[in-house]
A protein has these predicted regions:
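Pyridoxal 5′-phosphate
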Residues: 1-312
């Protein structure tokens, strides 16, 4: 039997074995509620603190700027809705037309509540032009949200320049980095990122857990009501096992980021060579500056059966 090759790692990734093993104690013996004041909660509470440090280090943030969530969708919704409701004098949001539906639908939601949203159109390679942002942003803009890398074609956006323009008008800058984190270097301080969304299952962590980086000083309202978890900003008992697994997976990926990128680019080039040799008429989509391994191609006048030629 031939080895199975999963070719949709932009949709999800396999759970890292080390991350899985790191989760086990928190699912078995150390199952205490980290929010409680007694001794049995101390180890889970410490595990959350250590996980925050690990994640923060990967993106050059402070541990107290990391807020655990259920994943990228919640993080995006929190960034959009929490920002829209926090300052009535700055109501406008600017985003792009190629964002993930988690963010686009969150924007549609605030539009229904009277908050204006402007959608920027990228160029043919999926790049959002900073000059286009400069042309539409005003001092009434509260938030600019542009994804770090597109999940369909892999294009990496000019994040630092877009953030600079946002800040020049007093706006905060959010990026959905779900597809980018652990695959390309991210420095939230150097890039001027105020908020960043991430999801563990995109970097070999468990599903159902993620985080939102919120720069110290950014005003954001809680998305849900309940207990005082996550510094009083995100109610709900913390999923300690998954958070620990996420931190371990991110630590492993970030420590080998350059090595992994080099390996994946070799595989990417090998696949493209194979496609050229197949005789299929195709074009590569996206920009030269893209996430390693994210390959988008369009085929001319080809039916599904022809694609098997590539692998035989």
């Amino acid at each position: 039997m031939k080895q199975f090759i999963y070719a949709d790692n932009a949709a999800t990734t396999k759970l890292n074995k080390e991350a899985f093993n790191a989760m086990i104690p928190w699912l078995t013996d150390e199952y205490g509620n980290a929010s409680q004041p007694y001794a049995f909660a101390r180890k889970p509470k410490k595990a959350l603190a250590e996980s925050r440090k690990i994640i923060a280090k990967c993106i050059n943030a402070l541990p107290e700027e990391i807020y655990f969530t259920s994943g990228g969708t919640e993080s995006d919704n929190w960034a959009i809705k929490g920002s829209a409701s926090s300052d009535p004098d700055k109501r406008a949001t600017i985003t792009s037309a190629i964002e993930h539906h988690a963010l686009l639908n969150a924007c549609a939601s605030i539009e229904r509540h009277g908050y204006p949203v402007t959608y920027l159109s990228p160029d043919s390679e999926g790049t959002v032009d900073p000059e286009q942002l400069s042309a539409v942003i005003t001092d009434r803009t509260r938030l600019v949200s542009i994804m770090f890398s597109n999940n369909e074609i892999g294009t990496i956006e000019p994040i630092a320049e877009l953030a600079r323009i946002a800040h020049s008008h007093g706006a905060i800058f959010h990026t959905d980095a779900v597809q980018a984190i652990a695959h390309t270097p991210i420095d939230v301080k150097a890039m001027g990122i105020d908020m960043l969304s991430a999801s563990a299952h995109k970097f070999n962590g468990p599903k159902g857990v993620g985080f939102l980086y919120i720069r110290k000083g950014v005003e954001l309202r809680p998305l849900n009501d309940g207990g005082a978890q996550e510094f009083g900003m995100r109610a709900g008992t913390e999923n300690v096992a998954s958070i620990v697994g996420m931190a371990k997976a991110l630590e492993i990926s970030c420590s080998a980021l350059n090595e992994n990128a080099e390996h994946i680019l070799k595989l990417e080039n090998a696949l493209l060579e194979r496609l050229k040799e197949s005789g299929l008429d195709f074009v590569r989509n996206g920009a030269r500056n893209h996430i390693p391994g994210n390959i988008s191609v369009s085929f001319k006048d080809a039916d599904g059966g022809q694609f098997f030629i590539v692998w035989t």
